[in-house]
From Swiss-Prot:
Classification lineage: Bacteria, Pseudomonadati, Pseudomonadota, Gammaproteobacteria, Pseudomonadales
Keyword Membrane: no
Protein name (database record): tRNA/tmRNA (uracil-C(5))-methyltransferase
Underlying gene: trmA
PANTHER family to which the protein is assigned, alphabetical: TRNA/TMRNA (URACIL-C(5))-METHYLTRANSFERASE, TRNA_TMRNA (URACIL-C(5))-METHYLTRANSFERASE
Annotated S-adenosyl-L-methionine binding sites: 187, 215, 220, 236, 296
Amino acid sequence: MSRPQFDPSAYAAQLEDKKSRLAGLLAPFAAPAPEVFESPREHYRLRAEFRLWRETGNEKRHYAMFEQGDKHTPILLEDFPIASRRINELMPRLKAAWADPALGFKLFQVEFLTTLAGDALITLCYHRPIDDAWRQAAEKLAAELGVNLVGRSRGKRIVVGRDYVEEELSVAGRRFRYRQPEGAFTQPNGEVNQKMLGWAYEALGQRDDDLLELYCGNGNFTLPLATRVRKVLATEISKSSVNAALANLADNAVDNVSLVRLSAEELTQALNEVRPFRRLADIDLKSYAFGSVFVDPPRAGMDPDTCELARRFERILYISCNPETLAQNIAQLHDTHRISRCALFDQFPYTHHMESGVLLERR
C-alpha cells in the first residue's frame, strides 16, 4: 500500500479536477452533469496495510509505508490520518504488544480491517511458522484490544475470534448487516460506500421485473437492490465472497436472491443455451423476466462479450473503479443505450483514483 498525500486544504480543488475529468470522458455520450458525493476529509479509510521497518543498529520497529514506485525509502508512521479512528486508536497499542517475542518475532506486515459499526480485525504476517505459543499470546492481545486476530505464515493461518468483521450500513432508512471477510475485497471508504448504495438504490427505482447482477462480491449492492425488484440472479467467482454473500443474505432475511458461482462469460453461455452448467441445475433461467443488469466490474471493465450481454437489458446500472474503461464500455453500448444519470463517488481522496456510476437506458 503506497502513502496518499494527505492535504485537506487541497481536497476541494482535487475533487473538482476529478469531476472535470469524469465529465470530459463522458462528454462524447451526451451525459448529464455528474452528481458528486464527497468523502470525509480524514479518518475515512476503513482498512490499511503497513510494513514493519527496523531501525539500523537496533531492534526498534515502526509502521512504514512507501511512495509510489519507491520500495526502498520508508515513511515511518506513528498514526495515519486517513485511516479510521479505530485504526489510529489501535496502532500504538499493537506496537506496544509486539515487544513480546511471541507476537513480534519476524513480524513483517500488519493489516487492519475496521467498520463504521466499530468492529475490527488485525492480520499479523510472519516470516516464521506460528504455533500454539503465538495463539496463546494472540488470544490475550485480542481480549485486551477488543479485536479479532488472524495470524499468517507460510502455509498456515490461525484465527482468534472471527475471520471477518461485521458492518452495518443504512440505505433508504433500512439497516443492512454485512460480514466482511479477512483478505476479501471490501469498499475501503465506508461513508462513501453508503452513499453509493443509496445512489444505486434510487437510480434503479422500484421495479416489477428481475435483476441480473454480475460481480456481486460479498453482496454489498445485492442486499439493498434486492428490495427494489421481484427476483435477483447474482454471480460471483470468488469462493470467499460467495460464502460471505450467502451469509449476508441469510442474516438480512433476503430471500429473493439466487447466487451462482459463475463468471460473466459462463453466464453468457448459459443464457445463450450454449452449454449447461451443473451449478445452475436448481435455477430455472426461463423463469426470470430480466429488466435490469447491475455490474461492478474490476478495473479492466467489462470484456466485449459481457458488454454484448448487458446490451440485452433495458437498464444497465454500472459502478466503475476506472473511468477510462467505463468510457470504453459505454462507447460499445452507446448505439443502443443512453446515459440518463451519472455520479462521482470520491472513494479515494488525495489520489487520482475515483469511483463512478452511470445508469444507461435503452434508446
